[in-house]
Design a protein with these regions (language model features):
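Catalytic phosphate/metal-binding cores of nucleic-acid and nucleotide-processing enzymes, i.e., regions
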Residues: 1-151
């Protein structure tokens, strides 16, 4: 049977490495960023840990807001394409983005058979913002077509 959020304690979850929720008011004009009490996760790992630990306590977010760029070193022009131009060597980025967090969250909802709650994307990275939105939209479309129950 599908889990329902109405039977759980809820919270609002904000994923961003730098900003506070209230700062999003200046460009999104959504009053929820200024009026809600948010749980803030600064990294993908912190996001995952928050979801899992609060789920174990019978809590699930009723609202999630995603940033995309969680590690600014990925966007340093000297380090594009996985090459550290400062030291002339290949590098591997270890920090995950908000897209990884959105994918985790969608998979978590599938695994526990719960509907995806309302999700916002406050990222200022247009390509990253669109990829997160598309991931969430694809899952919502899947839910509408097939339901969220596991087979």
């Amino acid at each position: 049977m599908k889990n329902h959020i109405m039977n759980m304690k809820t919270y609002s979850l904000f994923l961003d490495d730098i900003r506070e929720p209230r700062e999003c008011l200046t460009y999104l004009h959504d009053p929820r960023y200024g009026t809600r009490e948010w749980v803030v996760a600064r990294t993908h790992d912190e996001f995952v840990s928050t979801i899992l630990s609060r789920w174990a306590e019978g809590e699930f977010p009723e609202l999630v807001s995603f940033d995309h760029d969680l590690a600014d070193e990925h966007y340093d022009p000297a380090m594009y394409h996985g090459v550290d131009a400062y030291n002339n060597k290949a590098i591997e980025f270890k920090e995950k983005t908000g897209l990884d967090s959105a994918k985790f969250f969608v998979q978590f909802c599938i695994d526990v058979s719960i509907e995806l709650p309302e999700c916002l994307v406050h990222s200022m990275n247009p390509a990253g913002r669109e990829r997160i939105r598309q991931t969430l939209f694809d899952y919502e479309r899947y839910q509408q077509r097939f339901g969220s129950n596991k087979s």
